[in-house]
């Protein structure tokens, strides 16, 4: 049976600058529970401890968000996203105290070693720990397997590949998921973003390659161009004969019901979303990049290229300002030197 992890109340928070209310969390968690969703993930878009001036502040704290969801769930498990460095061990302790069932410990795809103490902390409490490798497009299959094996060694009961930038095509997904499935003794999962319009297709390919966990959001509600759309995914999974706890009819009832209390808009794929996917940048960076390009008067798409050269990962918003400022200075020098590009002068 395929496990569906619903990130609407976590990744969806990115789409509204992390402003979900307690009432919305309670209503959606209850509806998702009734729809037979396996795991309902809740929190700031960047996970436990993510609320900040840099990343965006939530109107309510982690405790109230999790307590609200916990009270609404009966059969669905409560999950959280945790990035070491943004969150602390105390944040996991709080989540476990409240009754979180699944802790997804997420690291950059080449930094799994920082997940050890948090996976161990979760397992010691008798709860489920998943490892998550973010920005998975930035590492080849063998490197991802080596990192996933570390998480497995630390006690992770599954490893999820996160296509955080919406960069991947089906062939890339197949190669990476197959490598992990063949090399691990634990389940493999996949989390897609829709920057190139491939989220559902990539999720189906991941399942064909042996993944047993897929992430999705109602109406695709999520960062950038959105996540895998839950209703579309479940319909396609039924067509392909995948067994789940839910059905298309149940998730359609869930989606329609959200119009009264959540009203998530299915994201449209904008040129900026395509650019962030093409250049492999975290989907949540789009509004920050657009703002910086406007403030410094530089070309938005040139800024995407520059940031891609820096190989940005989540949590490096300050570098967006740095590169926009550098582009502006280069433009000013170019004008002063009669059109000679700064990079030509330094070559």
Swiss-Prot record:
Cross-referenced InterPro entries: 2-IPM_HCS-like (IPR050073), 4OH_2_O-val_aldolase (IPR017629), Aldolase_TIM (IPR013785), DmpG_comm (IPR012425), DRE_TIM_HOA (IPR035685), PYR_CT (IPR000891)
GO terms for biological process, alphabetical: catabolic process; L-leucine biosynthetic process
Binding annotation for Mn(2+): 11, 191, 193
Domain of life: Bacteria
The keyword Metal-binding is assigned to this record: yes
Transmembrane segments: none
Protein name, per record: 4-hydroxy-2-oxovalerate aldolase
E.C. numbers: 4.1.3.39
Active site, UniProt feature: 14 (proton acceptor)
Annotated Pyruvate carboxyltransferase domain residues: 2-252
Family to which the UniProt record says this protein belongs: Belongs to the 4-hydroxy-2-oxovalerate aldolase family.
Catalytic activity: (S)-4-hydroxy-2-oxopentanoate = acetaldehyde + pyruvate
Keyword Zinc-finger: no
Coiled-coil regions listed in the entry: none
Keywords noted in UniProt: Aromatic hydrocarbons catabolism, Lyase, Manganese, Metal-binding
Xref: PANTHER family: 2-ISOPROPYLMALATE SYNTHASE 1, CHLOROPLASTIC-RELATED, HOMOCITRATE SYNTHASE-RELATED
Matching CDD domains: DRE_TIM_HOA
Site (Transition state stabilizer): 10
A GO molecular-function annotation: 4-hydroxy-2-oxovalerate aldolase activity
Binding-site residues for substrate, renumbered to this chain: 10-11, 164, 191
């Amino acid at each position: 049976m395929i496990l569906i992890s619903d990130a609407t109340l976590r990744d969806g928070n990115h789409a509204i600058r992390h402003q979900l209310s307690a009432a919305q969390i309670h209503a959606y968690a209850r509806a998702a529970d009734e729809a037979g969703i396996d795991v309902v993930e809740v929190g700031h878009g960047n996970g436990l401890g993510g609320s900040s001036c840099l990343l965006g502040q939530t109107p309510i704290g982690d405790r109230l968000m999790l307590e609200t969801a916990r009270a609404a769930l009966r059969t669905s498990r409560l999950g959280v996203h945790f990035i070491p460095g943004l969150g602390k061990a105390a944040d996991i302790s709080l989540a476990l105290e409240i009754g979180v069932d699944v802790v997804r410990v997420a690291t950059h795809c080449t930094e799994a070693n920082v997940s050890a103490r948090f996976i161990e902390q979760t397992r010691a409490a008798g709860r489920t720990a998943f490892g998550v490798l973010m920005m998975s497009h930035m590492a080849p299959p063998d490197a991802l397997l080596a990192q996933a094996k570390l998480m497995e060694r630390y006690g992770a009961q599954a490893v999820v590949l996160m296509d955080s930038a919406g960069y991947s095509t089906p062939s890339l997904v197949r190669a990476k998921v197959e490598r992990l499935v063949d090399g691990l003794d634990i389940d493999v999962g996949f989390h897609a973003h829709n920057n190139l319009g491939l989220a559902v297709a990539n999720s189906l390919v991941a399942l064909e390659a042996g993944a047993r966990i897929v992430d999705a959001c109602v109406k695709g509600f999520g960062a950038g161009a959105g996540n895998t759309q839950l209703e579309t995914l479940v319909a396609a999974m039924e067509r392909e004969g995948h067994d789940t706890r839910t059905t298309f009819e149940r998730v359609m009832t869930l989606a329609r019901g959200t119009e009264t209390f959540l009203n998530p808009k299915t994201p449209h794929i904008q040129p900026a979303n395509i650019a962030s996917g093409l250049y492999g940048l975290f989907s949540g960076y789009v509004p920050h990049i657009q703002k910086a390009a406007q403030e410094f008067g530089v070309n938005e798409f040139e800024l995407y290229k520059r940031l891609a050269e820096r190989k940005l990962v989540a949590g490096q918003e300050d570098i967006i300002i740095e590169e926009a400022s550098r582009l502006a200075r280069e433009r000013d020098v170019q004008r002063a030197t009669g059109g000679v590009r700064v990079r030509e002068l330094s070559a």
